[in-house]
Design a protein with these regions (language model features):
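Active-site-proximal beta-alpha core segment in soluble small-molecule metabolic enzymes
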Residues: 2-6, 10, 23-177
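Alpha-helical packing segments of well-folded alpha/beta enzyme cores
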Residues: 11-14, 18
Length: 177
């Protein structure tokens, strides 16, 4: 088995440079897959020490682990959409931001949130070419009912996944448009 050594001092320097270049724009640390194999909690701790307090994960168990490890005030976005009632209830209990990628997602979440008498904090996922999930750019009209008629959903953000950002600039620019 291979072992990786992460120089957290260098990581902190890199994060400081990233924060400086972001010039006040919020940064989300994507820590899916156990922090990409480097450890969810240790990587979240380094990010928090550097000033990054927004985390994105793909599993409910990761949201729970962050909360149990004391990351209670930090924003945690569940990147993977879900219509499973048990997952939605737990995400609401954990005060997670929940991804909405379709009208079905929104309808189910609105119902679960209404049953719990809470308003779900959500981010809308737009599919700009990854093909995994999300509203297509041509489906923007489907977002209006979420804002207009779903009283138990609050939309606080919108995001996409530029899957080839570092290796295919032409495709990335096309996705962004």
């Amino acid at each position: 088995m291979k072992t990786y050594l992460v120089d957290t001092a260098d990581l902190r320097k890199n994060l400081a440079n990233l924060i400086k270049r972001a010039d006040g724009t919020p940064i989300w640390a994507v820590l899916k897959g156990n922090g990409y194999g480097l450890g969810l909690i240790p990587m979240a701790a380094v990010c928090r020490e550097a000033g990054i307090t927004r985390f994105a994960v793909t599993e409910v168990s990761d949201v729970r682990a962050l909360r149990e490890a004391g990351f209670e005030k930090e924003e945690v976005l569940m990147l993977r959409p879900t219509c499973a009632g048990d997952e939605l209830r737990e995400l609401l209990d954990l005060n997670a931001i929940i991804t909405v990628s379709s009208q079905d997602d929104a309808t189910v979440l609105n119902g679960v949130a209404a049953q719990k008498n809470v308003v779900a904090n959500t981010h809308i996922k737009i599919d700009t070419g990854m093909g995994r999930y999300g509203f297509l750019p041509t489906e923007i009209d489907k977002l209006l009912p979420i804002y207009a008629y779903m009283d138990n959903i609050a939309v606080s953000g919108i995001y996409t996944h530029l899957h080839s950002a570092f290796c295919n600039k032409k495709q990335t620019y096309a996705q962004a448009e």
